[in-house]
Amino acid sequence: METTGQQLLSPREIDTKIHRLAYEILERHPKQAFVLVGIHRRGVPLAQRLAKVLEEERPGVQTGMLDITLYRDDPDQATFSPDFGHTRLPNDLKGALVILVDDVLYTGRTIRAAIDALFEYGRPSKIELAVLVDRGGRELPIQPDYCGLRQPLGRESYLRVRLREQDGHDGLFLVDNKHDAS
């Protein structure tokens, strides 16, 4: 699928950001085990790519995926997909360090929903957040622990993240309207 709009990150730059996120996680947790949990949709391939980089330094990184559709407080933003309901997490999360992974952090509502969903599977000892892009505009007091790019944008601006696993290519684009951002 072709994407129009101003390109903010190239495929190579996205790969560099993912590697940097992985190394920041390793620096903060050199010996502590953690679980990377990708938020459905584009958080899942990001978590898998982070795990692949982390595996080079620390084999056995656990990953999971989390569908938050039923936990959202903005149902008009929820999109049902063929993967709806597909949450896969390793074992019980009780006492685990969980690192949530998503592509873009905006209002914080997705992350709030993800935290609510996680607690259905056990009470983690700690939850951290890794995002490819923080675009600002928070409505809830949520901040990333690991961030590839901070790109402050107004409400009238939209980002489109493309990942090769889902879209055939990597890229981050500033697009004109909300429909181009999905």
Predicted regions and their residues:
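PRPP-associated nucleotide enzymes
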Residues: 1-182
